[in-house]
Swiss-Prot record:
UniProt modification remark: Monoubiquitination of Lys-124 gives a specific tag for epigenetic transcriptional repression. Phosphorylated to form H2AX134ph (gamma-H2AX) in response to DNA double-strand breaks (DSBs) generated by exogenous genotoxic agents in both the mitotic MIC and the amitotic MAC. Gamma-H2AX is also found when programmed DNA rearrangements occur, namely homologous recombination in the MIC during prophase of meiosis, and chromosome fragmentation and DNA elimination in developing MACs. Gamma-H2AX is important to recover from exogenous DNA damage and to repair breaks associated with normal micronuclear meiosis and mitosis and macronuclear amitotic division.
Cellular component terms per the entry's GO annotation: nucleosome; nucleus
Role, per record: Core component of nucleosome which plays a central role in DNA double strand break (DSB) repair. Nucleosomes wrap and compact DNA into chromatin, limiting DNA accessibility to the cellular machineries which require DNA as a template. Histones thereby play a central role in transcription regulation, DNA repair, DNA replication and chromosomal stability. DNA accessibility is regulated via a complex set of post-translational modifications of histones, also called histone code, and nucleosome remodeling.
Name by which UniProt lists this protein: Histone H2AX
Positions bearing the Glycyl lysine isopeptide (Lys-Gly) (interchain with G-Cter in ubiquitin) cross-link: 124
N-acetylserine found at: 2
Gene that encodes it: HTA1
Length: 138
């Protein structure tokens, strides 16, 4: 005889057998179920495997953590405690791989990287040195 009741669940199970999300099983913070739903309803393919949303969630979580870490460092360098779009832009553009990944991306309110062509900078010539010596000769 089986111990199953009306609902099909075993009677011996306790309340500790709660559902565990796929994000928790994978050890992720990003929602695997939501990403799975987006993949299915987005009509990217007729069928979506069970591992695809887990892998995509892991990749997105890694990229977000990487950008946030670099943006936090940029905020610290500017003596700020809050990350603003400017810090995110500086983080992405100063990292070679992230810059290549997001080359054609515009970040709203990010501004531009500070860059002055060395040719436009005033050159340090001997004229400034001779002025100092001339004043001492008098």
């Amino acid at each position: 005889m089986s111990t199953t009741g009306k609902g099909g669940k075993a009677k011996g199970k306790t309340a500790s057998s709660k559902q565990v999300s796929r994000s928790a099983r994978a050890g992720l913070q990003f929602p695997v179920g939501r990403i799975s739903r987006f993949l299915k309803h987005g009509r990217y393919s007729e069928r979506v495997g069970t591992g695809a949303p887990v892998y995509l969630a892991a990749v997105l979580e890694y990229l977000a953590a990487e950008v946030l870490e670099l943006a936090g460092n940029a905020a610290k360098d500017n003596k700020k405690t809050r990350i603003v779009p400017r810090h995110i832009l500086l983080a992405i553009r100063n990292d070679e791989e992230l810059n290549k990944l997001m080359a054609n991306t515009t970040i709203a309110d990010g501004g531009v990287l500070p860059n002055i062509n060395p040719m436009l900078l005033p050159s340090k010539s001997k004229k400034t040195e001779s002025r100092g010596q001339a004043s001492q000769d008098l």
